[in-house]
Amino acid sequence: MDFHNILVMASEQQGLNAVPKRYSLAVGPPKKVPKVKGVESAAVQAFLRRKEEEKRKKELEEKRKKERLLAKRIELKHDRKARAMASRTKDNFYGYNGIPVEEKPKKRRRTCENVSQAPEAEYATENEAEQLEFAQTESEYEQEEYDEKPSKAAVKPKAPPKSAPAPLNFADLLRLAEKKQYEPVEIKVVKKIEERPRTAEELREREYLERKNKRVETQKKKSEKEVKSAGISSSSKKATSLKECADAKLSRSAADKHAPPKSSLSSLSGTDKKPKAPALTEKHSRSFSSSKLSQMEKGKTSQNSSLKSPAAGSHSKLPANGMGKTGSSFPVPSSKPMANGAQRLPSAKESSLKKPVHTKPGNAAALQHETNSSAKRPSSSLGKGGSGHPAGGSSAGPGRSSSNSGTGPGRPGSVSSPGPGRQGSSSAAGPGRPSSSSSLGPGRLGSGSGVGPGRPGGSSSTGLGRPGGSSGTGPGRPGNSTNTAPGRLGSGMGTGPGRPGVGPSAGPGRPGSSSGTGPGRPGVSPSAGPGRPGLTAVKPRCTVVSETISSKNLVTRPSNGQINGMRSPPGHRPVFRPQGIGRPPVGYKRQIDDDDDDDEYDSEMDDFIEDEGEPQEEISKHIREIFGYDRKRYKDESDYALRYMESSWREQQKEEARSLRLGVQEDLEELRREEEELKRKRQSKKLRTR
């Protein structure tokens, strides 16, 4: 727009605005408001409407608040219940005997709720008005509950109480007394259960006995079923009765056998056990003859195994001195033999209990086969003189070295083959079992628990100039050795009275030879002459492991290494494997492999330290000096017992108190020593100053 036009328009407007507006300052007449008598309807209606609106709003607000409070109360109830449950379970966690918590009657419970809800009302509300309101709603709510409950109660009428049985007349009582007069009264004897923790051995014994009882019961049931179903002839009846009788006898003998190892574990000395050996052989022979009966085949196998296993336990108690004892004696299947019968076997009981666990019904057929075969043929290791003696105790359960003990009068120890030029592989005595008779030089007796008059049993080695097929082990030692060509003893040949032998004792000219005696002479049982029992010269190397960890529950059996002709590594212990059907004899194979093995000369092994020459006492002495541990002072615990060790609170407290007392004593001794040292120093200072 132009500036000129603007000016023109402004000038035009100027003339119009020139006349000013004027207001009169005079006061006008007063206005009169007309007064109406009565109430103005419009104002009242407006006021009432406002009031109603406010009321409605208030009610809505109240309703919302009430709902909110009720929801809160339900929530609180849940929380309280949860809290109560949590606290109850925490408080009652110990000492809960399985007694259910008594429910209070409903009225009392409701009053409790009322009491507990009063403080919650305060907690839930913000101001007094709300509190009042909450109390009202609460009471309403409770009234509703009261109304509901009686109606429910009215629906369920109470069951009439059972009337007590009518009391007997005096005459009836007398009659009943006459009737019952001569009837025997059964008094139930309450068995006192010992409230003490059982040892591992006891637990195992209990399991074994339970299993045996079950077996007997099942057999009885089977026989009864057969009797019922077949409508049996008298002959079959006789057979079953025979079977039951035999079962009962066997179980009784097994139970009897169980008791002596347990009771006479520590008290009986080695010499007390001498008369037991012949009786045991008789028992074995009896069991073999009975095993031939085809009728009782299945029933007997399991019982035979249970009979033999405790018997083996008592074998293991026979001492190792053969002085003046020419009866049949057995090599012992425990892993710790004794020297000269002085040291008792603590593992006798344990081995006897361990064995039944392994002889399961699954192995029954194999057991039967073993018993039959060994009963029918005499052991192959019998020499010219011993061909008439069948192996008395040669059949044992799996995992037991068979003892080919000759029962002839002049035959100490296990059966030996004295003929020269004979290879004595006695592994044919029973399939898959290490046999305890060995091939011998002329005039030498075999390895057994009693080896000639006055000669303690180490294992005797090969004869002159011939390889021995299977090792003769001393009592209870795993036979790791395989006798080889002249001048050489097989690996871990004979061991001393202490440990399972593993260390290879070599003959002259071999690396690491420590006990090379003359060619073919036994380096193990060097009895210096009749009447002087010489201790065995070659003793196994010992590691700390074999010193501290007990090797009791290992059942003796040569490991696979030996079977394949390999030497077992140092520190290796034979492992028990339950076998069903045994392996064929492997004496010849072992001999060939071992020859090859020995001919190989390993230059790297020149500087390998072998301490097999050191006697056991020497090693024990070193360990005692280093660790302050004397193995003679401690009772040998099996790994099983240690794993399942149980002790009561009182025992623990006793132990605590004892250790505390010892600790205090040690502290006092230390203080005394320190004081003595100080005194000595002072005295020495005084002497110097003078």
UniProtKB/Swiss-Prot annotation:
Residues 105-167, 186-619 are annotated as: Disordered. InterPro entries: Chromatin_SPT2 (IPR013256), SPT2_N (IPR054552). Residues 1-579 are annotated as: Important for interaction with DNA. Residues 383-396, 443-457, 465-477, 489-521 have a biased composition (Gly residues). One of its GO terms (biological process) is nucleosome assembly. The keyword Coiled coil applies. Residues 593-617 have a biased composition (Acidic residues). Residues 229-243, 397-442 have a biased composition (Low complexity). It comes from the Eukaryota. Its main location: nucleus. Residues 369-380, 545-565 have a biased composition (Polar residues). The keyword Transcription applies. Residues 40-82, 650-690 form a coiled coil. Residues 580-690 are annotated as: Important for interaction with histones. GO terms for cellular component: nucleolus; nucleoplasm. Interacts with POLR1A. Interacts with histones. Interacts with a heterotetrameric complex formed by histone H3 and H4, especially when the histone tetramer is not bound to DNA. Histone chaperone that stabilizes pre-existing histone tetramers and regulates replication-independent histone exchange on chromatin. Required for normal chromatin refolding in the coding region of transcribed genes, and for the suppression of spurious transcription. Binds DNA and histones and promotes nucleosome assembly (in vitro). Modulates RNA polymerase 1-mediated transcription. Required for optimal growth in the presence of the DNA damaging agents actinomycin D or mitomycin C (in vitro). Facilitates formation of tetrameric histone complexes containing histone H3 and H4. Belongs to the SPT2 family. This is Protein SPT2 homolog. It comes from Gallus gallus. The gene is SPTY2D1.
